[in-house]
Amino acid sequence: MDEIKEEFSFQIFLKIVINNKIIGSVRGYKEKDTCYIGRLIVHPDFQNQGIGIKLMVKIESIFKKVNRFELFIGIKSTKNLYLYQKLGYRPFKTEKLNENLYLTYLEKIIEI
């Protein structure tokens, strides 16, 4: 519980609610000139309806004074990779966590 309280102290959490149920969410925080985005989630019944894009556009607009956005996904998350690339994110690093888990890091640079 303390870990959750700590996350709420420095991160912005966004959610989309339909019929009193959270069907999508994303979080982000700023460190120096970078916004780190995490845990974009959309309920399976509501996927492919633009909700993920709406959440990403909104979180980016909240952190509009940064010059870089960064996030990571599992290397096998091709559907998520496509979504992020549509929004201007580009892979810049792959990290091996163990034999079965690789992460792809993506970034979006904002020209000021």
Model-derived features: positions:
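Acetyl-CoA-dependent GNAT
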Residues: M1-D45, M56, I62, E95-L97, ...
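Short acidic/polar active-site loop segments enriched in Thr and Asp
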Residues: D33, N67-F69, R90
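Active-site acidic-Proline motif in GNAT/NAT acetyltransferases
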Residues: H43-D45, Q49, K76
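Accessory recognition modules or surfaces
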Residues: I53, F69, L103-E111
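Conserved active-site alpha-helix within GNAT-family acetyltransferase domains
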Residues: I53-K54, S61, K76-T94
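Conserved GNAT acetyl-CoA-binding A-motif
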Residues: M56, I62-G74
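Conserved beta-strand-loop-alpha-helix junction that forms the acyl-donor binding cleft
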Residues: E70-L81, L97-L101
